Design a protein with these regions (language model features):
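N-terminal alpha-helical interaction blocks
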Residues: 2-12
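Cysteine-rich micro-motifs
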Residues: 48-62
Length: 523
């Protein structure tokens, strides 16, 4: 079976050769958009300005909305969902409550990673009716491949809210043009953008066993969302057309709030009360003037996309007009503060929904987040309780996700146990350092120590420095840790068992849909 990456590449080429069949080109043309091919990356895109470069920050010149957003509607983080739900309700969509971020209804993933996960595979295949049709949902998602970028690029998260716009319709009721127009109207009416500030990219998407064409939308270097039109599913016997055409629009809640306010970093708009609290408690100073100069180029420091990260730091420092050392010092402290805010919210969602840190599966990644946050506190000698931070998040999000506040006691108990385990691991560090004084500490050794004994590399480097030994932690350390524990079970996404003759037998009622904490039933 081909990988998602291979499926996407092949289908993108096919769609680019016949855009009128796969994209809402008639609607784009009516609005004055024209199709172009990016001079830098060769992506096909649509704009109204004649600009020959696509909307991607690497091609268009970084983030250009910071301190100068073209959005005329200024929305705070909570206000983004409220405005979105209000407009889409008027346009015939039903706003529904989020699903748990712990994906117990699926056997191919531990956590929800996109809003469409709520409905795969059985709603997408037409075997189960959706809770509403069409619908919108503010869905928390967990992904662990960008941990090293959090706090640095200004836009990366392990936990983010994907605002989903979804529909599951037979061919005779499908209107791709209508769905595209609705999201275009969000950009114009919700954010208050003019067409000349919007760039649409032709692309393809594959994931969860499904694939199809998609339209990404950008403004001033920032991708705001991506509207996918699912046409096919991947099966062991080959690609198959879906019985239902599926709309899968995923929009970054955090990015839309950030863009709307035009602040130096999205973390300031996503966790406003928590960031203010952490600054006061830690005494950390975020140089907003320097950060405002840095953030337009921060996207260049994505460790997954850069071959020589040290050279990239030098290039960015030159653009900002400061030394590499000064830039790294400033960004390091702010990145630590923002990472603690981000990791604590991710843990709040996961633990409130029944997740549990452990040494296996998805629980391993939760433990990675918690220990990284505590390690950053140790490195900067900050004393803040994670329980207190989690409570601040829950209070701020109460108007969208009241269940987080209700489940705080459960979250606090788990965090207390994990902290005790972390403190125990710290005691091992000094004895290990003593044994390693005369050894080369390779990246592989750091990974083994973290994976087998839970010893954070930052803590190891700090203890080593105290005895005159230098240990360098790789920039992509946590991505490599997560990769060690990744599962590749793509076949499960749409593969279903052979149907049995069950005529006359009453339907089974899935009780866990009504209570996600219910894990044992009789039938």
């Amino acid at each position: 079976m081909p990988t998602d990456k291979e499926i996407k590449k092949d289908f993108k080429l096919k769609a680019s050769q016949n855009p009128d069949e796969y994209y809402a080109t008639a609607a784009l043309k009516r609005e004055g958009f024209s199709r172009r091919k990016c001079k830098r990356c060769s992506t096909y895109f649509w704009n109204t300005t004649g600009n020959e470069f696509c909307g991607d920050p690497a091609c268009s010149g970084g983030f250009r909305f910071i301190g100068n957003t073209p959005a005329t509607n200024k929305l705070d983080y909570v206000g983004v969902w409220k405005k979105f739900a209000e407009l889409f309700s008027k346009w015939g969509y039903t706003p529904i409550e989020r699903y748990p971020v712990v994906a117990r209804w699926r056997d191919d993933t531990d956590f929800v990673q996109a809003s469409i996960y709520d409905f795969q595979p059985y709603v997408v295949s037409g075997e189960v009716a959706p809770p509403a049709n069409p619908l919108v949902v503010p869905q928390p998602c967990l992904r662990f491949n960008d941990i090293d970028n959090i706090g640095i690029t200004g836009a990366h998260y392990s936990c983010f809210i994907m605002i989903g716009q979804h529909a599951f319709l037979p061919p005779e009721q499908w209107s791709q043009e209508r769905f595209f127009t609705d999201i275009h109207n969000w950009l114009k009416q919700g954010l208050g953008l003019k067409n000349e500030e919007i760039t649409f990219h032709e692309d393809a998407w594959a994931g969860g066993g499904n694939f199809g064409p998609c339209m990404e939308y950008f403004s001033r270097g920032l991708e705001l969302g991506n509207q996918v039109y699912m046409l096919y599913e991947v099966t062991p016997s080959g690609n198959k057309e879906l019985n239902l055409k599926v709309l899968d629009m995923g929009m970054g809640h955090e990015r839309n709030a950030w863009f709307s306010q035009g602040k130096s970093t999205s973390y300031e708009t996503t966790f406003p009360t928590v960031v203010d609290f952490l600054k006061k408690q830690t005494g950390a100073h975020v140089d907003q003037t320097l950060m405002q100069k840095f953030l337009p180029y921060a996207s260049y420091l994505n460790v997954d996309e850069v071959e020589d990260i040290n050279q990239t730091w030098k290039d960015v420092a030159a653009k900002v007009g400061v030394s590499v050392e000064e830039l790294r010092k400033c960004v390091s402290e702010s990145a630590a503060l923002y990472s603690i805010a981000e990791h604590s919210r991710a843990l709040l969602f996961a633990l409130a929904d029944g997740g549990m840190p452990s040494n296996v599966g998805g629980g391993y990644n939760l433990r990675v987040l918690y220990r990284r946050a505590l390690s950053l506190m140790d490195t900067h000698k900050w004393e803040v309780e994670m329980n207190t931070i989690a409570k601040r998040h829950a209070e701020y999000l109460k108007h969208i996700f009241p269940e987080l506040y209700r489940n705080l006691e459960q979250v606090h108990r788990i965090l207390d146990v994990e902290k005790a385990k972390y403190e125990a691991s710290k005691q091992k560090t000094k004895s290990i350092i003593a044994k390693m004084l005369n050894e080369d500490v390779t990246d592989e050794k750091l990974l083994i120590l973290y994976d087998s004994q839970g010893i954070a590399p930052e803590l190891l480097a700090q203890e080593a420095a105290a005895v005159g030994k230098k240990i360098t932690v790789p920039e992509n350390f946590y991505a490599r840790v997560s990769a060690l524990h990744e599962k590749n079970r793509q076949e499960h996404a749409t593969k279903k068992e052979e149907k049995l003759p069950l005529d006359g037998i009453p339907d089974t009622e899935a009780l866990y849909f009504g209570d996600y904490l219910l894990i044992e039933n009789e039938g």
